[in-house]
């Protein structure tokens, strides 16, 4: 009997995904990109936000905290929780009025119903299992990105977008709104990784 211990597999625990109906979601789109960099350079780029304001103007507009070059307010030296600050530049989450990682910030009335209001307001959650993959969860979709080294200076990323069936069946929902945004961010990261290599 092999036991499954997710804490030993994930550096960023998948607990934040407990309310996502992952088993019922459908892989709708797949995108592959080969980057001329070492897989360690890819992960180094992924795990720091110092580059965000210079490399990701659209992302830092959507997630104001990233303009401060941090992922979490607790990353700051001397940080103490402040419950009276609602500005997402200081408290985290998406900019006012945004619902998901997309071109216009809209989830197009297709937010995942099993998510709590707090989870939706947070804007995004992550789990990662180095060096193989990371998962991004958003209010209307999930993106799984596999990291596949193919040499000392080459890595392929394979991104898959998962949506609920009812979202894909909704004729008013334009999935390209989220796919185009994520591809832009990944292309920007790929360029930064290659410059760093």
Language-model features, listed with the residues they occupy:
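C-terminal catalytic domain of Rieske-type non-heme iron oxygenases
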Residues: 1-197
């Amino acid at each position: 009997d092999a036991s499954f211990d997710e804490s030993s597999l994930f550096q960023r625990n998948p607990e934040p995904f407990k309310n996502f109906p992952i088993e019922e979601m459908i892989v709708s789109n797949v995108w592959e990109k080969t980057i001329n960099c070492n897989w360690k350079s890819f992960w180094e780029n992924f795990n720091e936000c110092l580059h965000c304001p210079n490399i990701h103007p659209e992302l830092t507009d959507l997630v104001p905290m990233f303009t401060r070059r941090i992922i979490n307010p607790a990353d700051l030296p001397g940080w103490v929780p402040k419950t009276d600050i609602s500005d997402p530049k200081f408290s985290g989450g998406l900019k006012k009025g945004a619902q998901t990682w997309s071109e216009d910030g809209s989830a197009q009335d297709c937010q995942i119903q099993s998510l709590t209001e707090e989870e939706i307001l947070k804007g995004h959650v992550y789990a990662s299992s180095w060096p193989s993959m990371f998962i991004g969860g958003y209010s209307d979709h999930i993106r799984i990105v596999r990291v596949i080294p193919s040499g000392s200076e080459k890595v392929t990323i394979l991104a898959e977008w998962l949506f609920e069936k009812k979202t894909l069946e909704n004729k008013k929902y334009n999935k390209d709104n989220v796919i185009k945004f994520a591809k832009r961010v990944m292309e920007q990261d790929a360029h930064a990784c290659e410059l760093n290599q």
